């Protein structure tokens, strides 16, 4: 193996490489891009104080020209994104399954860069729209960059990449008026769904709570496609990739998501940024599902169909490692905007399958980067550079940074001893899996891809009653925005193939006739792994609004705040005004927000500490009432209990914890923390 391949990476390898490109203007004199010091930056060069600007003003020309060209084309999809750095560690050697080097040594921390994104909206759209979320990970391995380019939903709308432009044209704003932004609640999207029923399964996921995640830190990630693991002996297995968030999978409610879009359009990116800035870690475990080659046709679904998942009860997920995200980016444009992911960026031991959507993506990603990043050398942009050296005969082109020495730029050659020379498998060279392929040229999908509804039914049947009601409400909202009654009827008809009761509820909600009920299958299949009801629940990293005013109880508040801090809960003190408030015993407390600057939708729970000042405050009442209606935990003590009663008409119920004149507020604190950890109290009667 060459010296290049012997170089070990660690969690800091990428950061150390990026350090070569960082610059800090603090304490520096201003210069032009050519290094010439600038003496004036507020006035252009003119002929007299009121005269015309002179063309010889090179500083003005350079400054304005650069400004005019600052923006690059935004991504056609996944335009709004946010990135973060971290590292990945495998738990145990995966030698039995793959030769991928980064999956062998548990002591190695492979640096990663992750970009989370929405799909449909433009770069300036809101974070909390109903949509799939992108979850793309770039591993900077010793063998080159490996990109796992996935979503937070394990399936996709279409089966063949040739339909991708049609899908995107359908869900993007309608071209005649460029509306609506970052939303699928319009005619063209649902017309596409009605006439392309392969999308039914993915639509069920996007209409579910998965379409409005609470946080990037609390959503799963999936590779979507079927790939291959190949080991040293050449044995291959089909594989699907999963990211499992350590905090569990949690979502917003739709009313809350819409309000957050107005109150804080940056809600998800702010949540991620602040968590890491405050010293927190964002963690996901990497899992794989594997199927032996000889079992390819063992199942009642085609394992290469991207509109199908592999039920975890049939093909268990093997957890193989953990990713820790722990460093924010230094510059969003240089990193998040310029990063270029590609499902074709693989390393030895990971290979492709004949998934027709994956095959098309292998072309499309390179093609789109060429125009977005200005040419074929985007791999030299710092965030995209591998941490291992690269050597080939790809020369020149726009923005070339590498200075290639010598006269040889071709293969084979004798002038340079045939260097750079191909590497054998033993030397780390990538060898494609030798799959036998035969068939006649044909534009047709396999009959095994024609089952559009079985897994959509599986998803529906696996939902809890609350999750089902959320799906129904989402359909009624989205399809209710459609102007064409004909399209509405078609949508109802399509989803009558999934569940008759679901179709009937949608029909009722949008005012069309329900189709005749189809004969229901006697066998009702479920997959418990698909429901969020069974997810991990913890109070760690949750965000609590503490409502307090002058006259608050010092002992009570100190006890509760310390308990929340011990659980890793973030607290904001909210009051009528910014500045300090005073307890009954004279202790001061500073407010970090007011009822004008923040809102209950930005928090996971509310603790009404009270104080005489807030007892009859209508803004405080509205704050609590909204949290109550969104099924959040509410704690109240002393005067806060009166505030709670005035807000929602009760001081009892699911997720409500109260205490008055307690000698010790430890028990109250614990009960409130448990209520926060539950995420939402869905059985609360609103």
From Swiss-Prot:
<keyword id="KW-0408">Iron</keyword>
<keyword id="KW-0376">Hydrogen peroxide</keyword>
<dbReference type="GO" id="GO:0020037">
    <property type="term" value="F:heme binding"/>
</dbReference>
<dbReference type="InterPro" id="IPR020835">
    <property type="entry name" value="Catalase_sf"/>
</dbReference>
<dbReference type="InterPro" id="IPR010582">
    <property type="entry name" value="Catalase_immune_responsive"/>
</dbReference>
<dbReference type="Pfam" id="PF00199">
    <property type="entry name" value="Catalase"/>
</dbReference>
<feature type="compositionally biased region" description="Basic and acidic residues">
    <location>
        <begin position="1"/>
        <end position="27"/>
    </location>
</feature>
<feature type="active site">
    <location>
        <position position="78"/>
    </location>
</feature>
<dbReference type="Pfam" id="PF18011">
    <property type="entry name" value="Catalase_C"/>
</dbReference>
<dbReference type="GO" id="GO:0046872">
    <property type="term" value="F:metal ion binding"/>
</dbReference>
<keyword id="KW-0560">Oxidoreductase</keyword>
<comment type="similarity">
    <text>Belongs to the catalase family. HPII subfamily.</text>
</comment>
<dbReference type="InterPro" id="IPR024712">
    <property type="entry name" value="Catalase_clade2"/>
</dbReference>
<dbReference type="GO" id="GO:0004096">
    <property type="term" value="F:catalase activity"/>
</dbReference>
<dbReference type="InterPro" id="IPR041399">
    <property type="entry name" value="Catalase_large_C"/>
</dbReference>
<dbReference type="GO" id="GO:0006979">
    <property type="term" value="P:response to oxidative stress"/>
</dbReference>
<feature type="active site">
    <location>
        <position position="151"/>
    </location>
</feature>
<keyword id="KW-0349">Heme</keyword>
<keyword id="KW-0749">Sporulation</keyword>
<feature type="binding site" description="axial binding residue">
    <location>
        <position position="365"/>
    </location>
    <ligand>
        <name>heme</name>
    </ligand>
</feature>
<dbReference type="GO" id="GO:0030435">
    <property type="term" value="P:sporulation resulting in formation of a cellular spore"/>
</dbReference>
<comment type="function">
    <text>Decomposes hydrogen peroxide into water and oxygen; serves to protect cells from the toxic effects of hydrogen peroxide. Involved in sporulation.</text>
</comment>
<dbReference type="GO" id="GO:0042744">
    <property type="term" value="P:hydrogen peroxide catabolic process"/>
</dbReference>
<dbReference type="GO" id="GO:0005829">
    <property type="term" value="C:cytosol"/>
</dbReference>
<dbReference type="InterPro" id="IPR043156">
    <property type="entry name" value="Catalase_clade2_helical"/>
</dbReference>
<protein>
    <recommendedName>
        <fullName>Catalase-2</fullName>
        <ecNumber>1.11.1.6</ecNumber>
    </recommendedName>
</protein>
<dbReference type="InterPro" id="IPR002226">
    <property type="entry name" value="Catalase_haem_BS"/>
</dbReference>
<keyword id="KW-0479">Metal-binding</keyword>
<dbReference type="InterPro" id="IPR011614">
    <property type="entry name" value="Catalase_core"/>
</dbReference>
<feature type="region of interest" description="Disordered">
    <location>
        <begin position="1"/>
        <end position="43"/>
    </location>
</feature>
<dbReference type="InterPro" id="IPR018028">
    <property type="entry name" value="Catalase"/>
</dbReference>
<keyword id="KW-0575">Peroxidase</keyword>
<dbReference type="Pfam" id="PF06628">
    <property type="entry name" value="Catalase-rel"/>
</dbReference>
<dbReference type="InterPro" id="IPR024708">
    <property type="entry name" value="Catalase_AS"/>
</dbReference>
<dbReference type="InterPro" id="IPR029062">
    <property type="entry name" value="Class_I_gatase-like"/>
</dbReference>
């Amino acid at each position: 193996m060459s010296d290049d391949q012997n170089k070990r990476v660690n969690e800091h390898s990428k950061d150390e490489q990026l350090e070569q490109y960082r610059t800090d203007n603090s304490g520096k004199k201003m210069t032009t891009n050519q290094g010439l010091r600038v003496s004036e930056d507020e006035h252009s060069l003119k002929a007299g104080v009121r005269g015309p600007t002179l063309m010889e003003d090179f500083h003005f020309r350079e400054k304005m020209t650069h400004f005019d060209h600052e923006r690059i084309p935004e991504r056609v999809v996944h335009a709004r994104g946010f990135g973060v750095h971290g590292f990945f560690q495998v738990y145990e050697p995966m030698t039995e399954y793959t030769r991928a080097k980064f999956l062998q040594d548990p002591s190695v921390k492979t640096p990663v860069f992750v970009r989370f994104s929405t799909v449909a909206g433009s770069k300036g759209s809101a974070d909390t729209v109903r949509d799939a979320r992108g979850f793309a990970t770039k591993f900077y391995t010793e063998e080159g960059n490996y990109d796992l380019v996935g979503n937070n939903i394990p399936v996709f709308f279409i089966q063949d990449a040739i339909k991708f432009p049609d899908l995107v044209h359908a869900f993007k704003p309608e071209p005649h008026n460029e509306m609506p932004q970052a939303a699928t609640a319009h005619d063209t999207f649902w017309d596409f769904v009605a006439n392309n029923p392969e999308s039914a399964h993915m639509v069920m996921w996007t209409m579910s709570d998965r379409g409005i995640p609470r946080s990037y830190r609390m959503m799963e990630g999936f590779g979507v496609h079927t790939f291959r693991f190949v080991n040293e002996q050449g044995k291959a297995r089909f594989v699907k990739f999963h990211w499992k968030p350590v905090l569990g999978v949690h979502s917003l409610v739709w009313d809350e998501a819409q309000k957050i879009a107005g109150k804080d359009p940056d809600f998800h990116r702010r949540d991620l940024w602040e968590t890491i800035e405050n010293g927190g870690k964002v963690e996901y475990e990497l899992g794989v599902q594997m199927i032996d080659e000889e079992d390819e046709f063992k199942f009642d679904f085609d394992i290469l169909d991207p509109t199908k998942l592999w039920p975890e009860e049939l093909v268990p997920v093997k957890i193989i490692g953990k990713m820790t995200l722990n460093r924010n980016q230094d510059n969003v444009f240089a990193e998040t905007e310029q990063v270029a992911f590609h499902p074709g960026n693989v390393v030895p031991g990971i290979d492709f399958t004949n998934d027709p959507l994956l095959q098309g993506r292998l072309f499309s990603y390179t093609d789109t980067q060429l125009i977005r990043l200005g040419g074929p050398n985007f791999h030299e942009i710092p965030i995209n550079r591998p941490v291992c050296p690269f050597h080939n005969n790809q020369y020149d082109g726009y923005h070339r940074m590498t200075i290639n020495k010598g006269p040889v730029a071709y293969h084979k050659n004798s002038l340079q001893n045939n260097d750079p020379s191909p590497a054998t498998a033993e030397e780390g060279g990538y060898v494609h899996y030798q799959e036998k392929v035969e068939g006649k040229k044909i534009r047709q999908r396999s009959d095994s891809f024609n089952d559009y509804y079985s897994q959509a039914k599986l998803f529906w049947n696996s939902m809890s009653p609350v999750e089902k009601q959320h799906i129904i409400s989402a359909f009624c909202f989205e399809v209710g925005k459609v102007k064409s009654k004909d399209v509405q009827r078609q949508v109802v008809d399509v989803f009558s193939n999934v569940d008759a009761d679901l179709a009937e509820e949608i029909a009722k909600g949008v005012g069309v006739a329900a189709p005749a009920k189809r004969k229901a299958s006697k066998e009702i299949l479920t997959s418990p792994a698909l429901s969020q009801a069974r997810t991990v629940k913890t109070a760690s990293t949750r965000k609590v609004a503490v409502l307090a005013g002058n006259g608050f109880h010092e002992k009570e508040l100190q006890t509760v705040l310390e308990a929340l801090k011990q659980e890793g809960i973030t607290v904001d003190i909210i009051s009528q005004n910014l500045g300090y408030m005073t307890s009954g015993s004279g202790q001061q407390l500073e407010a970090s927000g007011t009822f004008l600057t923040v809102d209950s939708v930005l928090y996971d729970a509310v603790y009404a500490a009270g104080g005489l000042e807030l007892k009859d405050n209508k803004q405080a009442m509205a704050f609590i009432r909204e949290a109550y209606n969104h099924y959040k935990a509410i704690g109240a003590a002393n005067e806060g209990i009166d505030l709670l009663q005035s807000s929602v008409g009760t001081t009892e119920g699911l997720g409500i914890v109260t205490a008055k004149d307690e000698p010790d507020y430890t028990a109250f604190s614990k009960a409130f923390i448990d209520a926060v950890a539950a995420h939402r109290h869905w059985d609360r009667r609103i």
